[in-house]
Amino acid sequence: MSEEKRKQHFVLVHGSCHGAWCWYKVKPLLEAVGHRVTAVDLAASGIDTTRSITDIPTCEQYSEPLTKLLTSLPNDEKVVLVGHSFGGLNLAIAMEKFPEKISVAVFLTAFMPDTEHSPSFVLDKFGSNMPQEAWMGTEFEPYGSDNSGLSMFFSPDFMKLGLYQLSPVEDLELGLLLMRPGSLFINDLSKMKNFSDEGYGSVPRVFIVCKEDKAIPEERQRWMIDNFPVNLVMEMEETDHMPMFCKPQQLSDYFLKIADKFV
């Protein structure tokens, strides 16, 4: 294989309340071995200060920066698409629209919908198993003309004990400084038509299990894999919900192995 063909384009999608900034450790590791990396700020996230989450009524609109990026790619270019946490829903929307532009989709301890149920199904299951006290003071506020939207802002305790408990304290501080309100768009996703086997379901999928994740525990990650089986499961030991901070070198090595296998 030529050196040029070996170089891949990785597109990295953050989770709720985060931004492209959360890939700051992984991006240079992939670039150092010659790959192209685009870390996307979704709508009203990261440095997109043109809008707040209360201006974004649907998950489709929230995903627009990702779908616009894929639209802009040359017809013959395929990407390795990575989604973290809620970013799995953004991946699914992109995969449904552009299956031909994605070599493989990587669900990094991410919500992974199926094609049999509503797009909100995995979130509904997650919510039914997550008691209110487990959110540790995370703020939820209705928004929109009919109050059908629900914004979410992680509490410092939830971030420290539920998301970043094994990550460096400096990365926790970075997260506390840069965190913005997000949404899970559950009402909107419950009204969307199911993802299709021909679109979303046709793209090869990899799931990376983070074994010490307290936000989406290992059993919930494995339930999603059983619910909609993937092509490959990889595991990260002693890794919390933020593997890009907790184990950036191992994570980037995993991404390279995935690209070698599926591209």
Curated annotation (Swiss-Prot):
Q: In which pathway does it act?
A: Plant hormone biosynthesis; Lipid metabolism; oxylipin biosynthesis
Catalysed reaction(s)?
A: methyl (indol-3-yl)acetate + H2O = (indol-3-yl)acetate + methanol + H(+); methyl (-)-jasmonate + H2O = jasmonate + methanol + H(+); methyl salicylate + H2O = salicylate + methanol + H(+)
Tell me yes or no: is Metal-binding among this UniProt entry's keywords.
no
Query: At the top level of its lineage, which domain of life is listed?
Result: Eukaryota
User: Mind telling me which residue stretches traverse the membrane in this protein?
Assistant: none
**Coiled coil regions, renumbered to chain:** none
**Pfam families noted in UniProt:** Abhydrolase_6
Under which EC number(s) is this enzyme classified?
Answer: 3.1.1.-
Inhibition and activation profile: Esterase activity is down-regulated by salicylic acid (SA).
Assigned protein family? Belongs to the AB hydrolase superfamily. Methylesterase family.
Miscellaneous section:
Expression of MES1 can restore systemic acquired resistance in SAR-deficient tobacco plants.
| PANTHER family associated with the record | METHYLESTERASE 1, METHYLESTERASE FAMILY MEMBER
What is the official name of this protein in its record? Answer: Methylesterase 1
Species:
Arabidopsis thaliana
- Gene symbol here is MES1
